[in-house]
Amino acid sequence: MAEQIAGSQARSNKWGGVFASLPAFDLAPTRTALVIVDLQYLDAHRDYGMGAEAKRRGTEEKYDYYFSRIENVVVPNIQKLQQLCRQRGIEVIFMRIASLVKDCRDVSAVHKRLRLFAPSGSKEAEILEEIKPIENELVITKGCSGAFNGSNLDQILANLGIKTLMFAGVVTNYCVETSVRDAGDRDYDVILIDDGCAAFTPQQHRFALEILNDCYCKVMTTDEVIAFIETAIEAQPRTPLATTR
């Protein structure tokens, strides 16, 4: 199993000549979670939040690549991953940017400066309809970029017995990258899903993945992740059927 995830990597850390590569790891479905970062109306929809502000300023063309990638690549791939994870008993966890109070005074200084305001209960705080949580799935609020720094995610994962995290979402080189680094520093096994993330430009996305891969995480495509999960399921020992005498 460990050899499979190592062998599936066409990408490698270009600094590997000095630093040791990230060791291969196994995946246990009951100890794994798909973490979807900030795919909400605030920053992932053309008509709300950041998208609406870009239209107001007449700069919407600057973000066309970003929103197109979310619509045509990221959302369809996350839908596939959600379906598989739900079938296989893998936790699906949503991180969202939101404030606890209506005036947003509780969010970080960076988010205040960037005007990333999404009061709880607002449309901007909602997860995109196409990938919305189903009953009993966790939606965790954060008030800054990092999933760990801005919430009690670490404690929740410990309570769930989670060891492996599969990250998808936006923005690749901002909230996603921060969360991946923090997860690595907390000794989680981390997979970053290449075609489950989006940045404002292809270059920003690619550079973030090059920096993170084989150091803080293993970068994989959706199809690679699906194959990895299915192989892990197949490798699980099966309980023998009870026999009657």
Language model segments and positions:
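A solvent-exposed, charged loop/short amphipathic helix patch at secondary-structure junctions
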Residues: D47-F67
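Short acidic, Gly/Ser-rich segments with clustered Asp/Glu that frequently serve as metal-coordination loops
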Residues: Q40-D47
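Short hydrophobic beta-strand that contains or immediately precedes a catalytic carboxylate
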Residues: V35-V37
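A structural signal for short, well-ordered beta-strand segments and their strand-loop junctions
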Residues: I93-M95
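Short catalytic/ligand-binding loop motif for oxyanion handling, primarily in non-cytosolic enzymes
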Residues: A44, V101-C104
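Surface-exposed cleft-lining segments at the edges of enzyme active sites
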Residues: D43, D64-I70, L165-M166
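Active-site-adjacent betaalpha module
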Residues: M1-A33, D47-A54, K80-R88, S99-L100, ...
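Conserved alpha-helical elements of sugar-nucleotide-dependent glycosyltransferases
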Residues: V74-N77
